[in-house]
Structures are given as structure tokens and as C-alpha cells.
From Swiss-Prot:
Positions contributing to ATP 2 binding: G1346, R1347, T1348, G1349, S1350, G1351, K1352, S1353
InterPro entries recorded: AAA+_ATPase, ABC1_TM_dom, ABC1_TM_sf, ABC_transporter-like_ATP-bd, ABC_transporter-like_CS, ABC_transporter_C-like, ABCC8/9, ABCC9
Amino acid composition bias (Acidic residues), ranges on this chain: 951-966
Localization per Swiss-Prot or TrEMBL: Membrane
Domain ABC transporter, residue spans: 665-912, 1312-1546
Source organism (scientific name): Oryctolagus cuniculus
General function of this protein: Subunit of ATP-sensitive potassium channels (KATP). Can form cardiac and smooth muscle-type KATP channels with KCNJ11. KCNJ11 forms the channel pore while ABCC9 is required for activation and regulation. Can form a sulfonylurea-sensitive but ATP-insensitive potassium channel with KCNJ8.
One Gene Ontology term from the biological process aspect of the record: potassium ion transport
Gene name tied to this protein: ABCC9
Binding site for ATP 1: G705, Q706, V707, G708, C709, G710, K711, S712
Name of the molecule in the record: ATP-binding cassette sub-family C member 9
Chain spans, region Disordered: 944-967
Cytoplasmic domain ranges by topology: 52-72, 123-132, 189-301, 372-423, 477-531, 593-990, 1056-1127, 1267-1549
Length: 1549
């Protein structure tokens, strides 16, 4: 055959009837538009004209979409598909002719090239934003439309119709070209780039002008969106450089938390307005979420429907292909009467065409499916960000009583943030399945009926009858889930208390008691988890068993009830449909489970959002301007309006200009006035009543009174933290009579600086804690730190004031934390300063320095209004105004002179106490507590430095090793799956259960493969031999036995996996709790509380409920995938040839993905913890944040942390989509190669059907493998974190002596012998005590003192073996304490700590958690601690409720309870560590006498709060640099004028 365009027949070139009457010339005419476009566009593309014409140079390639962008891409893809069909049709038609006719397919080839060029050209024009170049495309579509229309008309005139494939293709192309032409006309209409005088200029998107935005999914073209092509750069670059936060940049504006918060808030407020009209109705969060995020969910659902409908192309194509192979096998295919013109029916019945259509259908299905996943994930992330913002906004408005009275705990808030928001996010991920699954099932049943007739209804009936069981199981799952969450919350609350009070628990040897309490709650939680695991197993079993039962019922019924034999095409198309039905049935339990969790989460969220809030404080934050008259009267300055919505931002450069203001007139000097005030915490009785006070402007007001009289509550009531039952708090619009306007122009006259009684610090640097968001002023900062005596402490820190002091300031002492909080209040340039008992944790020396330098000089020189709550009555002489409190009421108000005149008895009482305090001040020669704090700080810093140094050394060693290794080794380590962690998890469940799981899984999937192979043999036998009834009974019996075995094994495997996971969770939590409880105290000093708590909350939740179902799904899908590859290879061995390149491609995709995924996962983890800690910090420091009016600043910080975490998670999700799209496309390639190999080489239609069946489902299996493997890798991070704590070294609780060998009443005498004692805090640190030798006689009262870092506190800890005694020994009553079991030692000694700690429960539990004491003994202890009357007044007495942290008692009362706790034990040895620092002077003197009386015959070791308290001691131990330098009575030591003790006394006078 000669090669020519129109064929070798001369008549083919005949144009006598006109050029358009010749089909060849008409086809040639269709080449013109394509040649035109290629001729115009190629120079532009190659020369780069478009890119050089860009008016805006930015870093992203695609930043602009012309109108109709997505429609253009969709139409172009459709046109390319039609061109492929046209090429195929032309080649087939040409093969039926005697000579070659290039005109049949050459224009189609050129059209394909031109269409591809058009979209590339369009993409470049969008990139350059040069729309005038679109004119070439407009002309192209016009010419293509005209030429195709001419061709279609000629076909119509020739009598062709829809039955002719070429006519149909031409008609479709006319429509597509016309639509593309309309798109171009629309662009001209909107952009006006041609034919109009004023072209419309379009600015680039705002996000893409920001170089920090690198998440490009919303901005790239449709092809890149569908394939995540834009992610290639990030995925590949991860091999060269780890992905960091800079690499992923910021979120686009539409995805930021603040944007989505506004949407959700508006929707929720609308629901609140509707609910307000119906008293019994609560606002619906569900409707609010739908209003805010409903549209993207509908879009995702549309994608899901399209994907599900395309999924049914698989069974139909299998049926057609197997039917063609069967006809070929039986020789029944009709090949006679072939026409040169290919009909549509012939084309669609061709086996190869069906294979290609199946391939394209799979590509589209997987593209739509991944698009659906992405949209739901993006929407879920947006929802989570909005919910976090709503929760945080609510936290900032929470009523203080909710937290202090135990109605809402920190653990509950953490659960809302860490668990409930994630539950809702995951539910949104699965949401489209709720309405997609029913449609998928119905469509499957309809197609099954068309294939098998009424027998298909039997299988459908099985599904319908068993469906109610799924509902029953889902109901039980909801009940189990609810009880599990309740027990989990209770367990976390107890765990949180243990972690906060771990030092006290260890010193009192109570850790096992509290551990047992947690374990008891854990047992209850595990019982609920067992029920949850059982019903989860049944749900998984039903999902696996229902399809097998349905297939069995369908085929057995068809075998006996139908008159026709079961053909391979019917059988395997039906099996494919049943396999499609597996997915919705499998997801059903998962969706139901997450729906249940979401319902519970919404209930909790709704309760939280509707909880009580603080009252309106518009009097302090109102928008109104201040009265102008007062400003003009006193300052002569122009009036100013203050924006109350802005966070505190003060100008501090005028500090040195501040001068003392003139005292205002008596009638104008009231800053705050409370009239007839009555306040309460929550809905309880009034805490404060009959409050009528005034706070003078620019003066020092002191509030004094006994412990628990309501001093702190009064401050909080003024700040609006308490509920106002009656009366008013009036903040006067006072003037600012400042000589200098510059000094006060930025000071908010309602602004308050507040130092709470309970110190609160940020997890930030010292400088950031002091400045607290205000601009840094070096002179003011130095003045503040000097006034608070902080500079010596700062000098001890490794990085000075740039050192991060940790969450909640856990690496600082109480006094150091208190002084930083006071420094924060002093630094702020506010009108009013509230200081709540700032001296409580300070010794007298520091207190006096703070009073003189900080309050009297720094604050009063600046003439600021100061309200001071204190027990230090010696400072009353400095007060301009005094408020005396008693039993929640104001006892007296006025100046000291007024009170002297009006209440002589009160004045004389104060005078007595003040004289005592003055005497104590004169005697106090050293700041002993300060030295203790600084020594403790130095020790902690040494510990951290040593730890950091060791880590740095390890990292350097690793880096050196990495440098020595080649690149392949480095990449192997980065891509390594955490198999060791997986093995540890699996072995935690027990080797027997692990073996049973593996064996049952292998056996189950072998049986499933046997079922399908049996069916292939059965149908092939019928197809070839038309076997009779006897053989049919044989096949039915075998099929039934195999299906029954498969159903039984499904039950066994589901139960085994869940039980193994439950056992592993039980063991891991038990080991973690015991390891933490038994850990050394330095571990808690160097590890943030939030980090430890996260192991018990989020990580334990993952191990409990997420890993088992993921593990089951992973093993199932992996074995199914391996089974599929094996069966395809068996059916068509030639497939193995194609499997090699496909396997190589899959390997490299995985290789690149895993590195990037690991980096992104680490970013997600690392950005999640700061977010959780910020919520925890805010909840703990709520009163401080609100007092400073810094809510806006903290909100902004929360939004930044949320966006940072969300962008990491979004990139991680996009990377998963990147992977799945590629694995899906590889799966489609497997289907294509398997189909062509089956069509070409197989002679057995049953095996062809079997191979196609497994090839079709392998795409699902590959996706499940990848998704579950990725999920498991993420979830194993929780196991890895838990395991990292399990490797921690525990304290050595064992001793060489057996507890039974220790005398029952030891120590009875209280004799202490210290022999050559050497102590250190860690093995790599220097000793803090060196060769100490001392002897303490029974019953002696011993005082310990020394300079900073001298080691005196280390000795007290050495008595309890809280530090490492590496040499020497301590002998108590003849027994070396190093030989004693640790629990025995600590349980026989008593200690009173500086920081008071109470636990939730009862007063009885806090005094005697071991339940060893009688009520009389407990009442005696309370009476000694001056608490008996107060406890008797409480409901329940000894059984009265104590809330978490003892928040329903004042700090002083909590310390008194701690003293009573020590009295209950009545050990012969008592150690007092600054025990009276938080109580008033009168109570302290009483307690000192009580200690001397109650412990008169016992040994008392005191870490001196005042030197005066140990001068009269029986023995004084003086330490210097870890060495005991002096040991004698106080008076004797004072006789040695050159001695250290005397020197300390003299230098501090």
C-alpha cells in the first residue's frame, strides 16, 4: 500500500462536485486552524514573549486566573479525550481500507497537538497577565468551530447519524469548540483587552504578593490542583534540606483562623438570637457550622458523587471484556460484514477500547475522589481553627468562679482544645460519606439486579436484614465512647494533680497512693474500652462478613433458582460490584463512630460556650471618650480619645521625666469607689458583703486582715472577676494632674497593672515576662529589676534575661517567680497598680527593699495609684489609706491616724504586731530565702546546661557520623519507618496475641482468595462444558464451605486485633504512669508539665482508640494487595513484566514522599505543643491577662500559633494527596496493563475475570495501604513519645534492708549523724555538699543558714534522698538511710514546704490520704493549725470538698492545711522549708510556738526564713560553698567575731 494523504486511488482527489464535496479535502480543511495555532504560539512559547511581558514580578508562577479558568481546563480535557477517540476511530477505519488514508487520523493527531499547545499557551498567558495574546486562541476556536461545523454538515448530508461513531465525535467536537469560543468571548467581555477603549486591569491576589505565602493550591491551574503538581518542588527539596516553618510559609488569608472564626462566630450568634426567642432551645452549633462551612462540603460531596458513579464503570467494563474473551474462547464472535465506517456500538464493544475506557474512568474517579478528600480536609482544618478561636475567646471571658470552684478544670479545657476540636475535624473529613454511601449502595444493587436478576435481591436482602445490627452496634459504641470519655477526663484530672504536686507526694511517700487512685480510674476506663473494643470488633466483623454472606446467598440462589448457568462475565462483574459495596459498608462503622464522637464533642463544646462569663466591665473598657473638663483644668492639655479595644501598648521613653504630682483636692482624689458592694463566687453565698470603700488617686492604699478574710477577693471584685450581687464599683474619670503631658499621654487612665497572689509566668524569656508586651525601655527595665532585686538572679541564668523560664515558671522558686510578677506590674506604665500580697514568698530583707525601692520610690514617685494587699503590718506607716478586712467585710477604713482615733483596740493590736515585726527586721541579718532561691536556680541551670551539653554532644557526634556516611546512608535513615516502635507496641500486647493475629490474618485472606478462585473455576467450567446438576452441587457445596470459613475467620481476626490493641494500651499506660511516678524530681524540673500531661491525654487517647482500628485496616489492606498482585500474576504471567517498572515508580514515589512527610509531621507535632501550652497558660493566668487588658494581644498570639499549626497540617495533608494521586494513577496503569495482557494472552475467561477483578480493586488496596501506613506512622509517634519516657531512669526505691527489718516506730529518738556526706544533683555535675560531718541530738531544734549556693537546702533534700548521695552517709537512729527502702524512709519523716499544695477531694483526704488517723487526731491537727472553727463551719466538716489545687481556699489557708498535714504525721523529725512565708505575722508567731510545743521532744530542722528564728536554736549549721564551716549554738557562734555566722549578721545589719 502506498502512503498518501487521501489514499492511492485517484478518485480520492476528485473535486468536480466542489472542494467541500470531497471528504478528504474537508479533513484537510480541518488542519488549517491547528497549523495556524501552532505557527502563532510556538514562537511565543519558545521565545518567552509572554513571560517577559509580565507587569508584576512575584515569586509564584501562577498567580492569576482569567474568567472561566476552570471551565476552560475541563473543556480542554474533554476535547483531548475526544481527539483520542477520533484518532482511534481513524486508525481502525483506515485499517479496514485497502490503502492508507492519512486524512482519517492525521487532522485528529494535529488537533490533539494543537489542543495541548492551547492550554500550555493559555497557562503562560495567565502567568504573564498579558491577555492580548489570547486573541490568537479566540481566532483558533472560531476557525476550529467553523471547520468542524462544515464537516458535521457534510456528514449529515451524506446520511450519517448518531449510530456512526465519526458523526458523533464530530458533533461533540463542534459543541466543545463552540463552548471554548464562548469562553474566549466572555474573557473579552470582562477583561476588555481588545475591541474596548478601557481595558480592565486585574491586580494579583493579595496572598501571592506576600512572599511568605507558599501554599499555592487555591491559586494554581486546574491540572496542578488535581495532581498537586505544585507540591513537587517541596517534596523533592526535602531530600536536600529538611522542611522547616520558613519553607511552608504562611496560610492564605481565606484559610487563616481569624477569617474562619468570624464566619463561624457570625453564624453562631445568629443561632443564639434564634434560640433567645425560645426559652427551652439552645443555639445549634451544627447549624452554625453548616452556615459557615456548608458550601465546600457540598462541593466535596459533588466530587464524591462523580467519583462513585465513575467507579461503576469498572464492573461494566469487566463484564464487556470477559464477554469478548469468552466469545473469542468459544468462537462465537461475529467478524463478518465489517464496514469501512466504524459504528458507535462496534467501538464500545471492542475489548481494547473498553480497557482504555476503564483506564480513563479510573483516572477520573481517583482525581475526583482525591479532590473530595482535599476539600473536606481543608474545610476541617478551617473549622478547627475557627473552633479554637471560639474556645479561646470564651476562655478569656470565663467567669473566674468556673475555674476556682471546680465547675470547669484545666483538664477539661485541655480536652476541648486537644481532643474535641480534632474529633469534629475528623468527622468533617468523613462527612461526605454519610450521603454518598446510600447512593453507592443503591446503584450497586440496581446493577446487580440487571446482571443476575432476582437472585441479586437475595444478596441485597441479606445486607438490608443485617443493617439493623450495625445500628445496634453503633448505639452501643456511643454508650461505650461516652463512658470512656468521662473516665478519661477523671483520670486526666487526677494525673494533672499528681504532676503538679509530685514533689510533695515524693517527700511524703504518697506517690503510690495517688498512683493507685489513677489506676482505679484507669480500670474503669479500661472496662469501657473493653466494651468499645468488643463492639468495634463486631462492627469490623459485620463489614467483612456481610459482603461474603451476600455473595454466598446471591450465587447459591442463582445456581438453583435461575434456569441459566452462571457465566464468568456475570460472576466477576457481580463480584466487582460487591467489592464496591465493601467500601461504604467498611466505612459505615467508622463514620458512625466519628459521628458519635462528634455529637459528644458538640455537646461538650456547647456546654462550654454557654457557661457563665464575667460581668460587663465597660466602665473600664468603654469606647466613650473621657471627660475633657478635668484634663483642661489640671493639665492644660488637649483632650484625647483612648481606644479601649487595642491591647496595652505604652510609650516608656518618658520614664525619666516623671515628676511627683500635686495632691488633688479631697473631693477629686477618688480613683475607685465601691458602694454597698456585695460579691460572690458563682451562684453561692456572698463572699464579700457591705463593702463601702474608696481608693484615693495617686496614693498608697493598703488592705490588711487575717488569712481568709477576703483581701484578695476584694481586689478581684474591683477588677470585675466576681459576681456582683448588689452595689456598684465606680472607676472615677479622674484627672491626670501631671505637669508634663509627655509623661502621661499614652497612659490609659483606667489601665491596671496587677500582680496576683498566685504568681503566673509565661513560657517565655525573663525579659518578655517583665515587659509583657510593652515596648522595651532600657532605663525603666533596669530600674524595675533593681527595685525587685532580680539582677543577681538574672545573672545566674545561662542566657541572662533572654533565658526561657519554662511553662508556669517551673524552673524558678516561688520567691523568684513572685518578684518577676511584681516587676511586670511595676514595668507597665499604668495609672493603677494592684499588688496582691507581693511579700508572701519574700524574706524581710527583700520585702523591705521592694517596699522602699519599688513601691515608695518607683511607684509613688510616679504618683500612681497603688493598692497593696499585705500581712506586713510594719509597712502601715507608709500607707496613705488603709482598709482593714474581717470575715468578708470592711472592718475599718481611713488613714492610720483615723484608725488610731476611731478604733483604739484595733490600733493597739496592730501596734503590738508592728513592734514584733520591727524587732524581727532588726534581727534579720540575711536574705536566707533569697540565697536559697538563687542556689536552687543555679542548681537547676547547671542541670539544664549539663543536659543540653550532653544533647549537643550527642547531636555533634551524630552530625560527624552523618558527615562520614555517604548520602545514601543519610537518606536511608531519614526514610526509615519506625519499625522498632511498631515492634514495641505489638509486643506490648503480648506474644501470644501477636502470633494469633498474624496466623488468623494469613489464614483468613488465604480463604478469601480461595473463594474467588473457586468461583473462577466454577464459572469457567460452566462456560466450557455446560456442567450438569451433579457438578453444580459440588461447586455450590465447596463455595459455601469456603464462605463459612471466611466469615468465621473475619470474627476471629477482628477480635484478636482489638484485644491485642487493648492489652498494649493497658500495659503502656501502666508502665508510663509508674515510670513517671517513680522518676527523679529533676525530671519534673526540666520537663514542662504540659509535655508530660500530653502523654497521658492526646497520646494515650491515640494508643487507646486509634491505633487498633488503623492496625487492623493496614494488615487487611496489605494482605489484600499482596493477594491481588499474586492472583493477577497467576492469571496473566506476562503482567509480571509490567509490574517491574510500576514497582520501581511506586518505590521512588514512596521514597520521596516519606522524607517530606516525616518533616511535615514533625512540624505538625512541634507546632501543636506551643498552641496547647498557650491555652493552658491563658487559663491559669486569666485574671492577670484580663486585669492588664491584654486579651487582644493574647488572642493574636493564639491566632498565630493556630495558623502555624494549621499550615503544617495542611501541607501534610496535601503531601498525602500528592502521594495518593500518584499511587491511584499507578493503580490505573496496573489495570490497563492487566486488561491488555488478559485480552491478548489468556484463553480462560474465568481467570481473565479473576485477574481483572483483582486489578480493579488493587487501586483501593494501594490507597488503603498508603493511608493506613501514613496514619500508623503518625500514630506510632504517640507510642514513641511514651516509650521515650519509659527509658527514663527511675529513683532507686529498693534498699539493702527489708521493710520488715525497720523498727515499727523508727525513727523514735530523732538522732541524726552525718558522716562525710557528699551530694550532687546529677552525675555530671559538681558536688553541692562536700564531706559534711554533723551530729544532731534527739529533740534538738536545728537551724540551717548560709550564703547563696552554700548547700543548706541540699542537706534537707538529702534527708529524703531526693538528691544523689555519692559518698558518705546519714544515720538516723542508728540506721543508714541509704540502706532503707525509699518509701519507708520518706514515710517516717515530715516536711513542710514553702508552696502550699492541696488536692481535689475532701479535707480528710488532704490531711490523711492513707486513712490511718482517727477523726479526733485530725481535729486536733486542725485546731493546732487554727483551722478547726473554719472547717466546722463548712458543709461536711472533715468531708468538705476541696477543689482542684485547693482553689476554694486562700493561699494562707492552704498553707495552714499543709501545716496541719505535718502535725497529723507527728514524726520524730520535722523539716520546715520556709513554711510560714505565705501567712501573716500573727499567725506565724502562733505557729512557731505551736511547733515548739507540739514537737518539743522531737527533732526540728529549719531552713531559716529569718535569722532571728534560728539564733536561739539548739544547734546552727552554717554552710559555705557546700562545706559545713560552723556548727554550734547561735549565741556561741556570735561570740566568734571573725566567724561566718557573725560576718553574715554584721554585714546585713
Amino acid at each position: 500500500m502506498s502512503l498518501s494523504f487521501c489514499g492511492n486511488n485517484i478518485s480520492s482527489y476528485n473535486i468536480y462536485d466542489g472542494v467541500l464535496q470531497n471528504p478528504c479535502f474537508v479533513d484537510a480543511l480541518n488542519l488549517v486552524p491547528h497549523v495556524f495555532l501552532l505557527f502563532i504560539t510556538f514562537p511565543i512559547l519558545f521565545i518567552g514573549w509572554g513571560s517577559q511581558s509580565s507587569k508584576v514580578q512575584i515569586h509564584h508562577n501562577t498567580w492569576l486566573h482569567f474568567p472561566g479558568h476552570n471551565l476552560r481546563w475541563i473543556l480542554t480535557f474533554a476535547l483531548l479525550f475526544v481527539h483520542v477517540c477520533e484518532i482511534a476511530e481513524g486508525i481502525v477505519s483506515d485499517s479496514r481500507r485497502e490503502s492508507r488514508h492519512l486524512h482519517l487520523f492525521m487532522p485528529a493527531v494535529m488537533g490533539f497537538v494543537a489542543t495541548t499547545t492551547s492550554i500550555v499557551y493559555y497557562h503562560n498567558i495567565e502567568t504573564s497577565n498579558f491577555p492580548k495574546l489570547l486573541l490568537a486562541l479566540f481566532l483558533y476556536w472560531v476557525m476550529a468551530f467553523i471547520t468542524k461545523t462544515i464537516k458535521l454538515v457534510k456528514y449529515w448530508q451524506s446520511g450519517w447519524g448518531v449510530s456512526d461513531l465519526r458523526f458523533c465525535i464530530t458533533g461533540i467536537m463542534v459543541i466543545l469548540n463552540g463552548l471554548l469560543m464562548a469562553v474566549e468571548i466572555n474573557v473579552i467581555r470582562i477583561r476588555r483587552y481588545v475591541f474596548f477603549m478601557n481595558p480592565q486591569k486585574v491586580k494579583p491576589p493579595e496572598d501571592l504578593q506576600d512572599l511568605g505565602v507558599r501554599f499555592l493550591q487555591p491559586f494554581v491551574n486546574l491540572l496542578s490542583k488535581a495532581t498537586y503538581w505544585w507540591m513537587n518542588t517541596l517534596i523533592i527539596s526535602a531530600h536536600k534540606k529538611p522542611i522547616d516553618l520558613k519553607a511552608i510559609g504562611k496560610l492564605p488569608i481565606a484559610m487563616r483562623a481569624v477569617t474562619n472564626y468570624v464566619c463561624l462566630k457570625d453564624a453562631y450568634e445568629e443561632q443564639k438570637k434564634k434560640a433567645a426567642d425560645h426559652p427551652n432551645r439552645t443555639p445549634s452549633i451544627w447549624l452554625a457550622m453548616y452556615r459557615a462551612f456548608g458550601r465546600p462540603i457540598l462541593l466535596s460531596s459533588t466530587f464524591r458523587y462523580l467519583a462513585d458513579l465513575l467507579g461503576f464503570a469498572g464492573p461494566l467494563c469487566i463484564s464487556g471484556i470477559v464477554q469478548r474473551v469468552n466469545e473469542t474462547q468459544n468462537g462465537t464472535n461475529n467478524t463478518t460484514g465489517i464496514s469501512e465506517i466504524l459504528s458507535s456500538k462496534e467501538f464500545l464493544e471492542n475489548a481494547y477500547v473498553l480497557a482504555v475506557l476503564l483506564f480513563l474512568a479510573l483516572i477520573l474517579q481517583r482525581t475526583f475522589l482525591q479532590a473530595s478528600y482535599y476539600v473536606t480536609i481543608e474545610t476541617g482544618i478551617n473549622l478547627r481553627g475557627a473552633l479554637l478561636a471560639m474556645i479561646y475567646n470564651k476562655i478569656l471571658r470565663l467567669s473566674t468562679s468556673n475555674l476556682s470552684m471546680g465547675e470547669m478544670t484545666l483538664g477539661q479545657i485541655n480536652n476541648l482544645v486537644a481532643i474535641e476540636t480534632n474529633q469534629l475535624m475528623w468527622f468533617l473529613f468523613l462527612c461526605p460519606n454519610l450521603w454518598a454511601m446510600p447512593v453507592q449502595i443503591i446503584m450497586g444493587v440496581i446493577l446487580l439486579y440487571n446482571l443476575l436478576g432476582s437472585s441479586a435481591l437475595v444478596g441485597a436482602a441479606v445486607i438490608v436484614l443485617l443493617a439493623p445490627m450495625q445500628y445496634f452496634i453503633a448505639t452501643k459504641l456511643a454508650e461505650a465512647q461516652k463512658s470512656t470519655l468521662d473516665y478519661s477526663t477523671e483520670r486526666l484530672k487526677k494525673t494533672n494533680e499528681i504532676l503538679k504536686g509530685i514533689k510533695l507526694l515524693k517527700l511524703y511517700a504518697w506517690e503510690h497512693i495517688f498512683c493507685k487512685s489513677v489506676e482505679e480510674t484507669r480500670v474503669k476506663e479500661l472496662s469501657s474500652l473493653k466494651a468499645f473494643a468488643l463492639y468495634t470488633s463486631l462492627s469490623i466483623f459485620m463489614n467483612a462478613a456481610i459482603p461474603i454472606a451476600a455473595v454466598l446467598a446471591t450465587f447459591v440462589t442463582h445456581a438453583y433458582a435461575s434456569g441459566n448457568n452462571l457465566q464468568p462475565a456475570e460472576a466477576f462483574a457481580s463480584l466487582s460490584l460487591f467489592h464496591i459495596l465493601v467500601t461504604p459498608l467498611f466505612l459505615l462503622s467508622t463514620v458512625v463512630r466519628f459521628a458519635v464522637k462528634a455529637i459528644i464533642s458538640v455537646q461538650k463544646l456547647n456546654e462550654f460556650l454557654l457557661s457563665d462569663e464575667i460581668g460587663d466591665d465597660s466602665w473600664r473598657t468603654g469606647e466613650a471618650s473621657l471627660p475633657f473638663e478635668s484634663c483642661k483644668k489640671h493639665t492644660g492639655v488637649q483632650p484625647k480619645t483612648i481606644n479601649r479595644k487595642q491591647p496595652g501598648r505604652y510609650h516608656l521613653d518618658s520614664y525619666e521625666q516623671s515628676t511627683r504630682r500635686l495632691r488633688p483636692m479631697e473631693t477629686e482624689d477618688i480613683a475607685i469607689k465601691v458602694t454597698n458592694g456585695c460579691f460572690s463566687w458563682g451562684s453561692g453565698a456572698a463572699t464579700l458583703s457591705n463593702i463601702d470603700i474608696r481608693i484615693p488617686t495617686g496614693q498608697l492604699t493598703m488592705i490588711v486582715g487575717q488569712v481568709g478574710c477576703g483581701k484578695s477577693s476584694l481586689l478581684l471584685a474591683i477588677l470585675g472577676e466576681m459576681q456582683t450581687l448588689d452595689g456598684k464599683v465606680h472607676w472615677s474619670n479622674v484627672n491626670e494632674s501631671e505637669p508634663s503631658f509627655e509623661a502621661t499621654r499614652s497612659r490609659n487612665r483606667y489601665s491596671v497593672a496587677y500582680a496576683a497572689q498566685k504568681p503566673w509566668l509565661l513560657n517565655a524569656t525573663v525579659e518578655e515576662n517583665i515587659t509583657f508586651g510593652s515596648p522595651f525601655n532600657k532605663q525603666r527595665y533596669k530600674a524595675v529589676t533593681d527595685a525587685c532585686s532580680l539582677q543577681p538572679d538574672i545573672d545566674l541564668l545561662p542566657f541572662g534575661d533572654q533565658t526561657e523560664i519554662g511553662e508556669r515558671g517551673i524552673n524558678l522558686s516561688g520567691g523568684q517567680t513572685e518578684r518577676i510578677c511584681v516587676a511586670r506590674a511595676l514595668y507597665q506604665n499604668t495609672n493603677i497598680v494592684f499588688l496582691d500580697d507581693p511579700f508572701s514568698a519574700l524574706d524581710i530583707h527583700l520585702s523591705d527593699h521592694l517596699m522602699q525601692e519599688g513601691i515608695l520610690k518607683f511607684l509613688q514617685d510616679d504618683k500612681r495609684t497603688l493598692v497593696l494587699v499585705t500581712h506586713k503590718l510594719q509597712y502601715l506607716t507608709h500607707a496613705d489609706w488603709i482598709i482593714a478586712m474581717k470575715d468578708g467585710s470592711v472592718l475599718r477604713e481611713g488613714t492610720l491616724k483615723d484608725i488610731q482615733t476611731k478604733d483604739v483596740e484595733l490600733y493597739e493590736h496592730w501596734k503590738t504586731l508592728m513592734n514584733r515585726q520591727d524587732q524581727e527586721l532588726e534581727k534579720d541579718m540575711e536574705a536566707d530565702q533569697t540565697t536559697l532561691e538563687r542556689k536552687t536556680l543555679r542548681r537547676a541551670m547547671y542541670s539544664r546546661e549539663a543536659k543540653a551539653q550532653m544533647e549537643d554532644e550527642d547531636e555533634e557526634e551524630e552530625e560527624e557520623e552523618d558527615e562520614d556516611d555517604n548520602m545514601s546512608t543519610v537518606m536511608r535513615l531519614r526514610t526509615k519507618m519506625p519499625w522498632k516502635t511498631c515492634w514495641r507496641y505489638l509486643t506490648s500486647g503480648g506474644f501470644f496475641l501477636l502470633f494469633l493475629m498474624i496466623f488468623s490474618k494469613l489464614l483468613k485472606h488465604s480463604v478469601i482468595v480461595a473463594i474467588d478462585y473457586w468461583l473462577a473455576t466454577w464459572t469457567s467450567e460452566y462456560s466450557i462444558n455446560n456442567t450438569g446438576k451433579a457438578d453444580q452441587t459440588y461447586y455450590v457445596a465447596g463455595f459455601s464451605i469456603l464462605c463459612g470459613a471466611g466469615i468465621f475467620l473475619c470474627l476471629v481476626t477482628s477480635l484478636t486485633v482489638e484485644w491485642m490493641g487493648l492489652t498494649a494500651a493497658k500495659n503502656l499506660h501502666h508502665n508510663l504512669l509508674n515510670k513517671i511516678i517513680l522518676g527523679p524530681i529533676r525530671f519534673f524540673d526540666t520537663t514542662p508539665l504540659g509535655l508530660i500531661l500530653n502523654r497521658f491525654s492526646a497520646d494515650t487517647n491515640i494508643i487507646d482508640q486509634h491505633i487498633p482500628p488503623t492496625l487492623e485496616s493496614l494488615t487487611r489492606s496489605t494482605l489484600l494487595c499482596l493477594s491481588a498482585i499474586g492472583m493477577i500474576s497467576y492469571a496473566t504471567p506476562v503482567f509480571l513484566v509490567a509490574l517491574v517498572p510500576l514497582g520501581v515508580a511506586f518505590y521512588f514515589i514512596q521514597k520521596y514522599f516519606r522524607v517530606a512527610s516525616k518533616d511535615l509531621q514533625e512540624l505538625d507535632d512541634s507546632t501543636q505543643l506551643p498552641l496547647l501550652c498557650h491555652f493552658s497558660e491563658t487559663a491559669e493566668g486569666l485574671t492577670t491577662i484580663r486585669a492588664f487588658r491584654h486579651e487582644a494581644r493574647f488572642k493574636q498570639r493564639m491566632l498565630e500559633l493556630t495558623d502555624t499549626n494549621n499550615i503544617a497540617y495542611l501541607f501534610l495533608s496535601a503531601a498525602n494527596r500528592w502521594l495518593e494521586v500518584r499511587t491511584d494513577y499507578l493503580g490505573a496503569c496496573i489495570v490497563l496493563t492487566a486488561s491488555i495482557a488478559s485480552i491478548s494472552g489468556s484463553s480462560n475467561s474465568g481467570l481473565v475475570g479473576l485477574g481483572l477483578l483483582y486489578a480493579l480493586t488493587i487501586t483501593n488496596y494501594l490507597n488503603w495501604v498508603v493511608r493506613n501506613l501514613a496514619d500508623l506512622e503518625v500514630q506510632m509517634g504517640a507510642v514513641k513519645k511514651v516509650n521515650s519516657f519509659l527509658t527514663m531512669e527511675s529513683e532507686n526505691y529498693e534498699g539493702t534492708m527489708d521493710p520488715s527489718q525497720v523498727p515499727e516506730h523508727w525513727p523514735q529518738e530523732g538522732e541524726i549523724k552525718i558522716h562525710d556526706l557528699c551530694v550532687r544533683y546529677e552525675n555530671n555535675l559538681k558536688p553541692v555538699l562536700k564531706h559534711v560531718k554533723a551530729y544532731i541530738k534527739p529533740g534538738q531544734k536545728v537551724g540551717i543558714c548560709g550564703r547563696t549556693g552554700s548547700g543548706k537546702s541540699s542537706l534537707s533534700l538529702a534527708f529524703f534522698r531526693m538528691v544523689d548521695i555519692f559518698d558518705g552517709k546519714i544515720v538516723i537512729d542508728g540506721i543508714d538511710i541509704s540502706k532503707l527502702p525509699l518509701h519507708t524512709l520518706r514515710s517516717r519523716l515530715s516536711i513542710i514546704l514553702q508552696d502550699p499544695i492541696l488536692f481535689s477531694g475532701s479535707i480528710r483526704f488532704n490531711l490523711d490520704p492513707e486513712c490511718k488517723c482517727t477523726d479526733d487526731r485530725l481535729w486536733e491537727a486542725l485546731e493546732i493549725a487554727q483551722l478547726k472553727n473554719m472547717v466546722k463551719s463548712l458543709s461536711g466538716g472533715l468531708d468538705a470538698v476541696v477543689t482542684e489545687g485547693g482553689e476554694n481556699f486562700s493561699v494562707g489557708q492552704r498553707q495552714l492545711f499543709c501545716l496541719a498535714r505535718a502535725f497529723v504525721r507527728k514524726s520524730s523529725i520535722l523539716i520546715m522549708d520556709e513554711a510560714t512565708a505565705s501567712i501573716d505575722m500573727a499567725t506565724e508567731n502562733i505557729l512557731q510556738k505551736v511547733v515548739m510545743t507540739a514537737f518539743a521532744d522531737r527533732t526540728v530542722v529549719t531552713i531559716a526564713h529569718r535569722v532571728s528564728s534560728i539564733v536561739d536554736a539548739d544547734l546552727v549549721l552554717v554552710f559555705s560553698e557546700g562545706i559545713l564551716v560552723e556548727c554550734d549554738t547561735g549565741p556561741n557562734l556570735l561570740t566568734h567575731k571573725n566567724g561566718l555566722f557573725s560576718t553574715l549578721v554584721m554585714t546585713n545589719k
